[in-house]
Amino acid sequence: MSNLITLGDKPGRDNSLFMLIRGAFHLIFVVVYVLFYFANIKDAHTTAKHINNGIPVALTFKEMVKGIYENGFPYLLIIPSYIAMTFAIIFPVIVTLMIAFTNYDFQHLPPNKLLDWVGLTNFTNIWSLSTFRSAFGSVLSWTIIWALSASTLQIVIGIFTAIIANQPFIKGKRIFGVIFLLPWAVPAFITILTFSNMFNDSVGAINTQVLPIFAKFLPFLDGALIPWKTDPTWTKVALIMMQGWLGFPYIYVLTLGILQSIPNDLYEAAYIDGANAWQKFRNITFPMILAVAAPTLISQYTFNFNNFSIMYLFNGGGPGSVGGGAGSTDILISWIYRLTTGTSPQYSMAAAVTLIISIIVISISMIAFKKLHAFDMEDV
């Protein structure tokens, strides 16, 4: 634990990064030890009360084993899960948290250089340094716009297609179901790379095949080549449309299952009361969908907030740059990737941005879950 405080004192011999990682592990071990210590004290206190009250307690080893098997068997089953969660989630989070408060960058790479604790410097640099301030503001604003627009689009398309497919007059529902599931069936990275070629400015199918068809009805498109991959605005439009295509099948399947579970009596009563299609949707269909699927719908926004693959595979975060190593279409998670790769990595700055992302996503998700009563199923 002492090495966690100093992070070494001799370059070349002391690897500050390894010391930090070992210190994080020791910290977890100490916390677990303290928890077990107080749990033993509580158990001893409970046992003493039982003895004083004449309640039988386990005194022999055989009785203790029997008591653990009968009363503690569920805890024995979940211990492996807690151990896995500790090393797969909690441990990396603690290491990331610690790195955010160091000067770990390309100028301080262990073991040749030592790391130092720098406090809140990385967080203040995001606001004080003009390059990072401008990049962070631009990337954060686009990340929010992207998450809201793309998620809302895929949810709207998914609900709309599910409602259409669930209508009794629709024939060949299985065929429509297969068609709607095609974007989900094909691996996302293949679809993204295919769209990347289709949106090519000069030879892509969108500009050379699709737009000429619409030009017959929209004269201003005649002969126009939209710069899908060379203009940041049009690239963002293409990204949002692509995510709508990639994400709606999941919402479609989820919504279709909910629609088929809604009793027809509700719609019949609404019909008798003179409700039109919009009133039925607003007062029956949508509330039922929201009551059941609210956690999943919220998770679509949090997923797209950190949707790295589409940004990286489509155009590498380009075109152009907004400073601070961020591309014009980078979201926060892809900006973090840029900060940790290349010839001048900024690991501590990336860790600081990661913590900011976590705080934003967790806060918004918790507020949304609470406002929508996402886990209150009593009234459904």
Regions found by a protein language model. Give the residues of each.
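Membrane-interfacial, low-structure loops and terminal tails that flank and connect transmembrane helices
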Residues: H50-Y69
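A structural signal for multi-pass alpha-helical bundles of membrane permease subunits
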Residues: M1-S2, K10-V30, Y37-H50, F73-V380
